[in-house]
Design a protein with these regions (language model features):
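N-terminal alpha/beta PP-like core and its mobile active-site loop of ThDP/TPP-dependent enzymes
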Residues: 1-139
Length: 139
């Protein structure tokens, strides 16, 4: 059976007991936004800022003693969530953070595989969020 990766992610969250997601929609996470919003096992709360999503997930875990997920878009969406992610990490509060990503073949990193041009940007509003969060996350 074929399934979209975004639907697999939503089903994975539900199968691991996640019932609540805090999100800000964005183009780089549009398939995730769609899958999370249509999954009957998930309640998605949309916020106005990514930092609010991370802080809401932290508060949710503190109050309900259960993990919540956060879904943000690429680039600035991921970096906007960092303050809340660090806060949760410092206090050992569990959160499941998902950051969208545009198609690899549309990024500058893909183009750089064919040239030696020293660009620091990965593409239009793209940023290597994995390197930034590696010191404040478990996985």
């Amino acid at each position: 059976m074929r399934i979209r990766l975004a639907d697999y992610v939503a089903d994975f969250l539900v199968s691991h007991g996640v019932t609540d997601v805090f999100s800000v929609v964005g183009g780089g996470a549009m398939h995730l936004n769609d899958a999370l919003g249509h999954n009957e096992g998930l309640k998605v709360t949309y916020n106005h800022h990514e930092q609010a999503c991370a802080m809401a997930a932290e508060s949710y875990a503190r109050i309900d003693n259960r993990i919540a997920a956060v879904c943000v878009t690429t680039g600035p969406g991921g970096t906007n969530a960092l303050t809340g992610v660090v806060g949760g990490w410092l206090d050992s509060i569990p959160m499941f953070i998902i950051s969208g990503q545009v198609r690899y073949d549309t990024t500058a990193r893909y183009a750089l595989s064919y040239t030696e041009t020293p660009l620091r940007a990965m593409g239009d509003q793209e940023y290597d969020i994995v390197k930034s969060v590696s010191n404040m996350t478990k996985y």
